């Protein structure tokens, strides 16, 4: 049986840092209020000249370098993003060109904050089916472009960044299973309800969110999908060495870990320094934990995320 194994990770954060104290001068909020409710202290903001593909390019180069391969060996590029460079072509196609990769499949996946899990699952299925040997999976966001910077309930939450993983087919277990779900009836609780018609933006092109509803729904479905992954692999929560959740806010992260019986010292949390980077948050956190030596060969790593749509999912990996 062929598995998809992670052979390299990479990440990139824009140079500009926006702290809670900076936000105090922009909207009616405080560092104490933001930290208490979200756990966020700062977030990175892309320069005006930086697009999602630029962030993705930097993260991808790091992953390719870590994987020790030539970029031209990549046969599949998937980018998870809510903030693409343009309407079309896909950010994945733009990234493919910037990497100098020749003819290979390239496309975007849009599942908001669950996007990386969806993209990883798709690449895993390609490799398991024998349709490709090496795949690049990226989560990249310039979420600052779709924020209403006068709305203190949302602008304090998000940041920009990118994370990437390089996968290759192997007989040794890597990605053990992936689990994807969606419930379109909950689409209105987290959205950016706008479209383009006749060259004009129709509706509100900024993030709107029913915070309490999102919190309750997220904790419920994340617990369920994690148990689904554990059951399929005949594991208990105590068998998980590292939980790497979507970095929405520390309350969702801590509540989910508590329900699962996973201590916080087994949870990789970067939300304090990155904020919520949507589809980029999981691969960003994964890269940091891989590079600082926390994740070791043979360990079980559980990724989980939830996002607008409403979408959610999990992936269980043997490192």
Swiss-Prot record:
Keywords: Acyltransferase, Cytoplasm, Fatty acid biosynthesis, Fatty acid metabolism, Lipid biosynthesis, Lipid metabolism, Multifunctional enzyme, Transferase. Catalyzes the condensation reaction of fatty acid synthesis by the addition to an acyl acceptor of two carbons from malonyl-ACP. Catalyzes the first condensation reaction which initiates fatty acid synthesis and may therefore play a role in governing the total rate of fatty acid production. Possesses both acetoacetyl-ACP synthase and acetyl transacylase activities. Its substrate specificity determines the biosynthesis of branched-chain and/or straight-chain of fatty acids. PANTHER family: 3-OXOACYL-[ACYL-CARRIER-PROTEIN] SYNTHASE (PTHR43091), BETA-KETOACYL-[ACYL-CARRIER-PROTEIN] SYNTHASE III, CHLOROPLASTIC (PTHR43091:SF1). The gene is fabH. This is Beta-ketoacyl-[acyl-carrier-protein] synthase III. The active site is at residues 113, 246, 276. Its EC number is 2.3.1.180. It is found in: Cytoplasm. Homodimer. It catalyses: malonyl-[ACP] + acetyl-CoA + H(+) = 3-oxobutanoyl-[ACP] + CO2 + CoA. GO terms for biological process: fatty acid biosynthetic process. One of its GO terms (molecular function) is beta-ketoacyl-acyl-carrier-protein synthase III activity.
